[in-house]
């Protein structure tokens, strides 16, 4: 995130933040070195206190900084300055590095190169670069200073301050305004004849109370009002498959509209204090830097009106209406009486969006409306089609660790206004809506329908007018990677600035990873998009950045994420269990699917089952066919979406087929989730919220790792959107894509293709066994290899 800066500009910025004293030109080299080093020590509040602390820093293995300065040096060597710099950055001499070889430590941690400093000009620029360098705690040194109170000297000035293109924490976090308003919707989802009131929580700098207008970071969070725990009532998945031709193509039916009044000239200050807490670290970080943080769950949320209708156009409309209030185009009231209007007069009219999972999903939904004022989205782990979240290729497919969840259950989780005991209108309407969702989502057949079509945001991507950042985990089996892959294929073709980050996590945030300065990049991004400052953000990093699965500190810069990043390679499974690039398969092989019976007997978790299954444990072998490649002689990277063709017959008139690609070979792999190195060690500002430094690290050796997988209903052999009759013993040709990937197989690894039926963590788990016969002559795997 460091923006290349001229020495002249660096000097100007250092003067502006009172780091470089006005009289610097009259100071000697040694005096300036003492002052600049002392200024980093923000916890020392007087010059005497700062000078006293200089003796705590070693220049080499014999001399402390105070003693070094007594000789009034006119220069400092690269090694000496590196020692001082590393200690200022939080590294411990003799523990983290040797005082006799600090340059090696700098190289190890990818710090800027140190050099001999022989003039005051070089010294000043070296400190400018140092302030922009990441410390041991993962933050740039300037942010470490902020956590110690350096920028409290600017509290109350009521203006943004920028440094290296990024906003500084100069806003008084001890006096943040926390308020609630009620936006009136055009929707009447609870059927009471009035527009639903949508509670909106605002956290904004106290400085915005006067003349300063600030941009807003809006997080559309259905969870903000609270979460109703209903896991125990999730749908039963231990049931036999249903004939998909009973499908009736459930329709989407729009809710009635009640036109809201236009905003008047009235503007009464908010009268309700916010008791809810910000739930997103990036927002808190940027709140201290002048960006208001706005949260709303919209329809169905606590203290508000309406009914949660998961993924529906109504959900999109209600969340969009919050932005319309922020830009002055919609009415909001101080309370539920609807008597006094209140405006977002503090807002500049520039809005960005943040959030992960459902919160990221609603960014996509709102962006497709092209709503005025929305300048950018940073959408993490987002659903781009609800069918791709709860279904796949004609099957009911659960998100990871959410077996039995569906649209109706998620709506219940987020219907927090049910906790408002007096809201009898919501309760009655909610029960009716639950019945409608249960019927329309069609858990019996799993087929695509008009209901799901209305919940596919990708079909409205042409409406996107704002800049775009997508963030997703390549190992996210909750919101599976094709959600981001398929919206990316749309967005990259639009005339908007767009970027993509892919990390090695599951359903996870990446803003505090050691290996990338993501938070600083987002600071730079939002300054450009919402403060409208030309700071080079668009050119600062590549179009696509992908974290390596072998070395967590390596990120690949790519121009795109698509099949054409690689070359097509065709593999054929053979009767003797090989996955071959030179031999075509012949003959037929049969496996017996056991449904969920053996899994239930084993009494293990879905995660444990998956590891045992992909590792090839014998007790699961009967329920699959496995084909292994030869060992790879060189590292090989798979990109894009693998495709399989399987000619298969089942001994029943229904069937489900699953396919997995697995990396085989006992070795250390990265942890599934990042390891936290120090909890709460990254303060966002002075005496404010904090985050924890973390990263993926090598874990204990494992036998196998899932690369990607997919599932398909045998009855969709003719059409993915139209089921057909299936006869017992009838061979059908299935062709479908697996989840997209970017995965490097190291030398010595084997690639394994597994063909099976019941996926215990995702598919239904039939109560009966079923035989599947695969015709190898009609079966192949297409990969894209870099």
From Swiss-Prot:
Keywords, comma-separated and alphabetical: Aminopeptidase, Cytoplasm, Hydrolase, Protease, Serine protease
Domain of life (superkingdom): Bacteria
GO CC term (a single one): cytoplasm
Broad class of where this protein is predominantly found: cytoplasm
EC nos: 3.4.14.11
Family from the record: Belongs to the peptidase S15 family.
Active site: 357 (charge relay system), 476 (charge relay system), 507 (charge relay system)
Subunit architecture: Homodimer.
Subcellular location field: Cytoplasm
Species for this entry: Lactobacillus delbrueckii subsp. bulgaricus
Protein biosynthesis is among the record's keywords: no
GO biological process: proteolysis
Cited SMART domains: PepX_C, PepX_N
Name this protein carries in UniProt: Xaa-Pro dipeptidyl-peptidase
InterPro entries: AB_hydrolase_fold, Galactose-bd-like_sf, Pept_S15_Xpro, PepX_N_dom, PepX_N_dom_sf, Xaa-Pro-like_dom, Xaa-Pro_dipept_C
Molecular functions (GO terms): aminopeptidase activity; dipeptidyl-peptidase activity; serine-type peptidase activity
Keyword set includes Cytoplasm: yes
Catalytic activity entry: Hydrolyzes Xaa-Pro-|- bonds to release unblocked, N-terminal dipeptides from substrates including Ala-Pro-|-p-nitroanilide and (sequentially) Tyr-Pro-|-Phe-Pro-|-Gly-Pro-|-Ile
């Amino acid at each position: 995130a460091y923006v290349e800066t001229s020495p002249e500009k660096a000097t100007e910025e250092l003067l502006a933040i009172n780091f470089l004293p006005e009289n610097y030109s009259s100071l000697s080299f040694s005096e300036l070195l003492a002052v600049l080093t002392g200024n980093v020590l923000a916890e020392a509040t007087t010059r005497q206190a700062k000078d006293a602390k200089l003796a705590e820093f070693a220049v080499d293995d014999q001399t402390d900084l105070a003693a070094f300065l007594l000789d009034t040096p006119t220069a400092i060597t690269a090694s000496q300055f590196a020692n001082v710099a590393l200690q200022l950055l939080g590294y411990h001499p003799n523990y983290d590095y040797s005082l006799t070889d600090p340059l090696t430590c700098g190289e190890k941690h990818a710090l800027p190169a140190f050099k001999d400093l022989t003039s005051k000009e070089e010294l000043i620029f070296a400190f400018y670069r140092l302030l922009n360098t990441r410390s041991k705690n993962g933050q740039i040194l300037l942010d470490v200073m902020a956590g110690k109170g350096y920028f409290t000297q600017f509290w109350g000035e009521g203006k943004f301050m920028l440094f290296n293109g990024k906003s500084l924490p100069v806003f008084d976090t001890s006096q943040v305004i926390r308020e609630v308003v009620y936006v009136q919707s055009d929707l009447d989802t609870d059927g009471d004849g009035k527009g639903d009131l949508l509670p909106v929580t605002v956290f904004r700098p106290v400085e915005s109370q006067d003349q300063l207008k600030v941009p807003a970071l809006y997080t559309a969070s259905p969870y903000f009002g609270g979460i109703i725990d209903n896991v125990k009532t999730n749908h039963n998945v231990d049931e036999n498959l249903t004939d998909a031709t009973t499908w009736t193509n459930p329709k989407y039916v729009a809710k009635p509209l009640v036109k809201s009044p236009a905003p008047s000239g009235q503007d009464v200050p908010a009268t309700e204090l916010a008791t809810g807490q910000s739930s997103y670290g990036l927002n808190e970080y940027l709140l201290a830097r002048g960006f208001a943080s706005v949260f709303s769950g919209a329809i169905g949320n606590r203290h508000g009106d309406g009914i949660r209708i998961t993924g529906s156009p109504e959900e999109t409309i209600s969340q969009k209406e919050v932005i319309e209030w922020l830009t002055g185009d919609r009415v909001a009231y101080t309370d539920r009486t609807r008597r006094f209007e209140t405006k977002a007069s503090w807002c500049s009219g520039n809005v960005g969006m943040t959030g992960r999972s459902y919160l990221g999903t609603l960014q996509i939904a709102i962006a497709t409306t092209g709503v005025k004022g929305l300048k950018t989205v940073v959408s993490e782990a987002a659903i781009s089609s609800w069918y791709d979240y709860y279904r796949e290729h004609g099957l009911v497919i659960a998100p990871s660790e959410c077996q039995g969840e569906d649209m109706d259950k998620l709506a219940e989780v987020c219907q927090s206004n049910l906790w408002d005991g007096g809201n009898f209108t919501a309760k009655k309407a909610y029960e009716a809506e639950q019945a409608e969702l249960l019927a329309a989502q069609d858990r019996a057949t799993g087929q695509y329908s008009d209901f799901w079509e209305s919940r596919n945001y990708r079909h409205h991507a042409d409406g996107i007018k704002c800049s775009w950042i997508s963030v997703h985990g390549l190992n996210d089996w909750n919101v599976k990677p094709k959600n981001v892959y398929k919206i990316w294929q749309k967005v990259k073709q639009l005339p908007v600035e767009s970027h993509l980050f892919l990390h090695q996590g599951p359903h996870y945030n990446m803003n505090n990873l050691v290996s990338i300065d993501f938070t600083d990049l987002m600071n730079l991004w939002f300054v450009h998009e919402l403060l409208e400052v030309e700071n080079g953000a668009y050119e600062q990093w590549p179009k696509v950045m992908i974290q390596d699965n072998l070395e967590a500190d390596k990120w690949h810069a790519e121009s795109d994420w698509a099949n054409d990043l690689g070359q097509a390679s065709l593999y054929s499974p053979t009767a003797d269990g090989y996955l071959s690039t030179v031999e075509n398969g012949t003959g037929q092989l049969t496996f017996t699917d056991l449904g969920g019976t053996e899994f239930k007997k084993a009494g293990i978790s879905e995660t444990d089952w998956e590891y045992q299954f992909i590792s090839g444990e014998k007790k699961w072998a009967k329920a699959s066919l496995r084909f292994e490649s030869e060992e790879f002689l060189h590292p090989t990277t798979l990109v894009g979406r693998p495709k399989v063709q399987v000619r298969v017959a089942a001994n029943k008139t229904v069937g489900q087929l699953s396919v997995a690609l697995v990396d085989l070979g006992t070795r250390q792999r990265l942890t599934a989730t990042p390891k936290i190195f120090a909890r709460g060690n990254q303060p966002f500002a002075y005496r404010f919220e904090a985050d924890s430094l973390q990263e993926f690290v090598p874990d204990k050796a494992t036998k196998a790792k899932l690369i990607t997988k997919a599932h398909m209903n045998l009855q969709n052999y003719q059409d993915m959107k139209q089921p057909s009759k299936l006869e017992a013993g009838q061979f059908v040709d299935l062709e479908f894509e697996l989840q997209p990937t970017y995965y490097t197989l190291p030398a010595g690894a084997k690639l394994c293709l597994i063909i099976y039926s019941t996926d215990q963590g995702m598919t239904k788990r039939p109560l009966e066994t079923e035989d599947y016969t695969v015709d190898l002559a009609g079966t192949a795997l297409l990969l894209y290899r870099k």
